[in-house]
């Protein structure tokens, strides 16, 4: 955990060099200033694994493909992880500028998940120093091999509730905190706590008009199996028009909140990391204004 906190510190240090002179959060001539909203804290609605403070615009559909290979530390026998992969596909839709819903399916435990994400308020130049969002989700696994007998719907279900508070400090640097509560009706193994609280964080440092460094991390509190550890992901965003391409390294196999919060096994700083990518493509489904 100390090494991860050091990474966040380094991201913050990158911000200090330009924080005093960057004009992005200053009033523009002729603007009201107080009500001017600040946008673009992150390139996508996800930092890497975690929800970000970004929202879909009304009428936009986000088609997402997430791919995570095996551990690089497995070596040449598994072609450094390329022979093993985990996959998630999802569709997110902006009902309004402040309300997004989504559904996805993962190969890890054959899980199906759905979520609702609402923006409570958005950062402005003068009156609101940060954005605040609330996300809640449902996850169900369909892999019956995890139980000695056919489990019921309730036995296969999990839920999460997350608060996301983030700030765009200047045109290059953004950071967020995202505490989350995950409840799994039947955890695996059964000795794990059903309710796990985790404190998460995410950061972005913009390198150029189209590229940025990103990082997200969660520290779970409670009883989990000894082989489970904190999920950490470090990546590079490449934005190209309607696409966002995220290349990253992560120790997490699962790509929904239940999976990566409660069942991450790789120890990142011991070489147990996976290479992966996220692809986001935005489609305009309906007109913003009628």
Predicted regions and their residues:
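Bacterial Sec-dependent N-terminal signal peptides
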Residues: 1-23
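C-terminal low-complexity, charged extensions that often adopt amphipathic alpha-helices
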Residues: 153-154
């Amino acid at each position: 955990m100390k090494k991860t906190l050091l990474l966040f510190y380094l991201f913050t240090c990158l911000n200090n060099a330009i924080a005093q002179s960057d004009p992005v959060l200053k009033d523009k001539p002729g603007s009201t200033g107080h009500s001017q909203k600040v946008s673009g804290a992150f390139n996508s609605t996800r930092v890497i694994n975690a929800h970000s403070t970004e929202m879909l615009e009304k009428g936009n559909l986000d088609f997402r493909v997430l791919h995570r290979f095996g551990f690089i530390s497995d070596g040449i026998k598994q072609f450094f992880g390329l022979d093993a992969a985990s996959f998630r596909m999802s569709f997110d839709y902006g009902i309004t500028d402040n309300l997004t819903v989504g559904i996805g399916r993962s190969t890890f435990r054959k899980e199906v998940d759905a979520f609702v994400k609402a923006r409570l308020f958005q950062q402005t130049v003068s009156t609101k120093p940060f954005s605040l969002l609330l996300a809640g989700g449902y996850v169900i696994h369909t892999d019956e091999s995890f139980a000695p007998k056919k489990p019921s719907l309730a036995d296969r279900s999990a839920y999460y509730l997350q608060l996301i508070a983030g700030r765009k400090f200047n045109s290059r640097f953004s950071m967020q905190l995202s505490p989350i509560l995950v409840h799994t009706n039947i955890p695996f193994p059964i000795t794990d706590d059903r309710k796990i609280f985790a404190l998460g964080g995410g950061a972005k440092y913009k390198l150029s008009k189209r590229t940025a460094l990103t990082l997200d991390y969660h520290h779970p509190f409670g009883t989990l199996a000894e082989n489970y550890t904190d999920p950490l992901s470090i990546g590079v965003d490449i934005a190209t028009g309607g696409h966002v391409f995220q290349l990253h390294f992560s120790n997490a196999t699962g790509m929904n909140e239940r999976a990566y919060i409660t069942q991450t096994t790789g120890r990142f700083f011991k070489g147990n990391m996976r290479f992966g990518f996220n692809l986001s493509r935005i489609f305009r489904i309906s007109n913003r204004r009628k």
